[in-house]
């Protein structure tokens, strides 16, 4: 049996109360403790217990106490916009935000979502997502998160959370921990090794806690045999003690399984408070928790700690000062009495545009230069004829794909389809459009034969397991394009000498059949671009902006190359260990089709002048625990820089990427791991300098014996380049043992 945390055996119940650490939480805790003294026992229980499913205007609601000026909390999905409300902005999915590799856009997206949440009176927005991380390329909810790489995911978590909470809404980092597939998610045990847990799955949550995230959501699954929402190991010992998390842990909806065990194991809030349609007999807390405290099964100090954490988070983001009332109801169509969208469509378009990854561009097929005629082929080119919101929680694939399905969705205020946007540009250019807006290969070939260039739209969808779409129970059954996309492309390619393929997808698909067609000259990965889908695509394929997205995962030549997939069983032993995605491909010497971090531009970039300066010694991080972990773990201990020059004739943005290889003294470690990136916009001929700061954590591995982060001694390798495989500059530095 794998043991997740080797030093976590403890018989006594311990309350991991937050202690002063000089962070943003100190004043919030002081005020929360004052408010706690005014609450009755019943009011305390009401703050930690959801009212029930559909018991208030939001998907989650708490009881309002009378003794203090504190509301019924409104908790609402989703990670890409406000679910069950309108009008709101339907932003690009997390996976697209990650594909921008742009910290400013990540923050702007978070800030815009937070502003809309606050404007609607939402106190807690249920996002962003760090789990699933995406170890299984066909995992149903991978698209809600940012990347399969923990470093990129962690940076995205931090920037998004800061944006959301700066706007006044509490963010909720989810799903904690090991929620990597939809099949059996309510019963599966994710058995994760100690080191893999820390270096992969916990890593982005560390960044969330460091960013002062208000709340964390525990997941449906078990972790090493214990339900995540009643695991002392991951909630008390890891999240609250090791990571120093001052906020509160809430359950996913109906993920609680006990009264006492969940309380003493670190759960602070239960949602929705009852088992959906079966109240009140299914409630675990409420009066049952009050009785458990009365008979001593749950210490009074534990209940007080729950309440203090929840109140402190409310004070932390300033929700005690003129916060708007809830302006919608989730249960009557969500029509809000205010319009909170402002100019957020501009942000949505920028994220969608800058997340587009150009995978192939032979003979400079793109950008388009006022072609005489264009065939637009595929159902994915148009908005669902029944409307973009026709299917509940987007649980269908009947038009252009702009988000996956499930609770991680929002209502489209509008959806700009690719065909509509292209037609608008074509009219200005005098280009004739020949449409074939079905997935019928014969019709597609006929349209392609009548045009100078053909653009074929294909997609691949997934989502949450409570909805099955075309036989896919959340997780994808395979990595093929849906609706016989390969056959559609083959037919069009046989009829046209100049074919562009646009992919809207939740994750990687196998492209070998498409790449085997000689007339396929360009492939564009557009992901899940949200409401501005068509406009963002036109911005790129017509050259208004050079593509600058980079893959947030690896695209393989065949599905088996990933070495991981969702399993049809109730136990997942995470046998991949540290070796997922590019770490696996690198270690096994497998050539990907398109590697992690890959993405073409309309220009080229030259790297030069690598400079490395690292000033640290080997040893363990032993600093005082602050939000995120030991304080010295986040100390800057070195810099790496490189010059990047735009050698082309058009402006473009390049993402310079830093990878570090640990010395041989670090046991069984992937050859290289992402430890920095910087996106730079450069004019033709312009040179810029990318600078990466290295922290102790960036140079450390998790030592399972010491139960600490350790910087190993020896020679570290430095790789800087345009992707995980396109390395332009290499160097090294040596770290000696400390004295």
From Swiss-Prot:
It comes from the Eukaryota. One of its GO terms (biological process) is cellulose catabolic process. Its EC number is 3.2.1.21. The active site is at 252. InterPro entries: Cellulose_deg_GH3 (IPR050288), Fn3-like (IPR026891), Glyco_hydro_3_C (IPR002772), Glyco_hydro_3_C_sf (IPR036881), Glyco_hydro_3_N (IPR001764), Glyco_hydro_3_N_sf (IPR036962), Glycoside_hydrolase_SF (IPR017853), Ig-like_fold (IPR013783). It is an enzyme of class 3 (hydrolase). Pathway: Glycan metabolism; cellulose degradation. One of its GO terms (cellular component) is extracellular region. Glycans are attached at residues 224, 398. It is found in: Secreted. Belongs to the glycosyl hydrolase 3 family. PANTHER family: BETA-GLUCOSIDASE, BETA-GLUCOSIDASE L-RELATED. Beta-glucosidases are one of a number of cellulolytic enzymes involved in the degradation of cellulosic biomass. Catalyzes the last step releasing glucose from the inhibitory cellobiose. This is Probable beta-glucosidase L. It comes from Neosartorya fischeri (strain ATCC 1020 / DSM 3700 / CBS 544.65 / FGSC A1164 / JCM 1740 / NRRL 181 / WB 181) (Aspergillus fischerianus). The lineage of its organism: Eukaryota, Fungi, Dikarya, Ascomycota, Pezizomycotina. The gene is bglL.
């Amino acid at each position: 049996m794998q043991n997740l945390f080797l030093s976590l055996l403890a018989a006594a119940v311990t309350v991991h109360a937050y202690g002063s650490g000089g962070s943003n939480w100190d004043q919030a805790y002081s005020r929360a403790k004052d408010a706690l003294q005014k609450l009755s026992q019943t009011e305390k229980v009401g703050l930690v217990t959801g009212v029930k499913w559909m018991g208030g205007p939001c998907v989650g609601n708490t009881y309002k106490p009378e003794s203090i000026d504190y509301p019924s909390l409104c908790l609402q999905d989703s990670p890409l916009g406000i679910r069950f409300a309108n009008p709101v902005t339907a932003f690009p999915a997390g996976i697209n935000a990650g594909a921008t590799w742009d910290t400013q856009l990540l923050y702007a997206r978070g800030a815009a979502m937070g502003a809309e949440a606050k404007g609607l009176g939402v106190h807690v927005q249920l996002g962003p997502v760090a789990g699933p991380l995406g170890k299984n390329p066909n995992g149903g909810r991978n698209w809600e998160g940012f990347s399969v790489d923990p470093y990129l995911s962690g940076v995205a978590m931090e920037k998004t959370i800061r944006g959301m909470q700066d706007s006044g809404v509490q963010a909720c980092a989810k799903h904690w921990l090991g929620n990597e597939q939809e099949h059996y998610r309510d019963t599966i045990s994710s058995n994760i090794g100690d080191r893999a847990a820390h270096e992969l799955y916990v890593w982005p949550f560390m960044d969330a806690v460091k960013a002062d995230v208000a709340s964390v959501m525990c997941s449906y699954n078990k972790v090493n045999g214990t339900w995540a929402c009643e695991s002392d190991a991951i909630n008390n010992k890891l999240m609250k003690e090791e990571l120093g998390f001052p906020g509160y842990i809430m359950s996913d909806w109906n993920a609680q399984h006990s009264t006492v065990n969940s309380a003493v194991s670190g759960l602070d809030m239960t949602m929705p408070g009852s088992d959906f349609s079966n109240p009140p007999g299914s409630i675990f807390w409420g009066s049952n928790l009050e009785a458990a405290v009365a008979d001593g099964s749950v210490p009074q100090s534990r209940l007080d700690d729950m309440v203090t954490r929840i109140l402190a988070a409310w004070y932390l983001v300033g929700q005690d000062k003129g916060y708007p009332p809830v302006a919608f109801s989730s249960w009557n169509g969500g029509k809000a009495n205010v319009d909170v969208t402002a100019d957020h469509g501009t942000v949505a378009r920028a994220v969608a545009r800058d997340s587009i990854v150009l995978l192939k561009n032979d003979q400079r097929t793109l950008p388009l230069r006022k072609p005489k005629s264009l065939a637009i082929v595929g159902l994915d080119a148009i908005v669902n004829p029944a409307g973009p919101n026709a299917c509940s929680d987007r649980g269908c694939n009947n038009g252009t794909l702009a988000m996956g399905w499930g609770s991680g969705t929002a209502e489209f205020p509008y959806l700009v389809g690719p065909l509509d946007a292209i037609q608008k540009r074509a009219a200005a250019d005098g280009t004739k459009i020949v449409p074939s807006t079905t997935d019928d290969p014969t019709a597609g070939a006929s349209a392609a034969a009548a045009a100078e260039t053909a653009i074929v739209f294909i997609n691949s969808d997934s989502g949450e397991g409570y909805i099955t779409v075309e036989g896919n129970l959340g997780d994808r059954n395979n990595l093929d394009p849906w609706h016989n996309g390969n056959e559609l492309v083959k037919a069009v390619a046989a009829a046209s000498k100049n074919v562009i393929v646009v992919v809207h997808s939740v994750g990687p698909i196998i492209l070998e059949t498409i790449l085997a067609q000689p007339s396929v000259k360009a492939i564009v990965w557009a992901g899940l671009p949200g409401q501005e889908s068509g406009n963002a695509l036109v911005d790129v394929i017509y050259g208004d902006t050079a593509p600058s997205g980079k893959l947030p995962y690896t695209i393989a030549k065949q599905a088996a190359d990933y070495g991981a997939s969702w399993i049809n069983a109730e136990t997942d032993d995470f046998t991949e260990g540290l070796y997922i995605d590019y770490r696996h491909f690198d270690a096994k010497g497998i050539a990907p089709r398109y590697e992690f971090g890959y993405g073409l531009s309309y220009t080229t970039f030259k790297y030069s002048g690598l400079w490395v300066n690292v000033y640290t010694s080997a040893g363990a991080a032993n600093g005082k625990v602050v939000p995120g972990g030991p304080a010295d773990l986040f100390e800057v201990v070195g810099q790496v820089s490189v010059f990047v020059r735009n050698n082309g004739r058009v402006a473009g943005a390049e993402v310079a990427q830093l990878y570090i290889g640990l010395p041989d003294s670090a046991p069984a470690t992937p050859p290289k791991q992402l430890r920095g990136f910087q996106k730079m916009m450069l004019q033709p001929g312009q040179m810029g300098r990318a600078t990466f700061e290295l922290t102790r954590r960036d140079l450390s591995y998790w030592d399972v014996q010491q139960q600490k982060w350790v910087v190993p001694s020896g020679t570290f390798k430095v790789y800087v380049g345009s992707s995980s495989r396109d390395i332009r500059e290499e160097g090294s530095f040596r770290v000696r043992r400390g004295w």
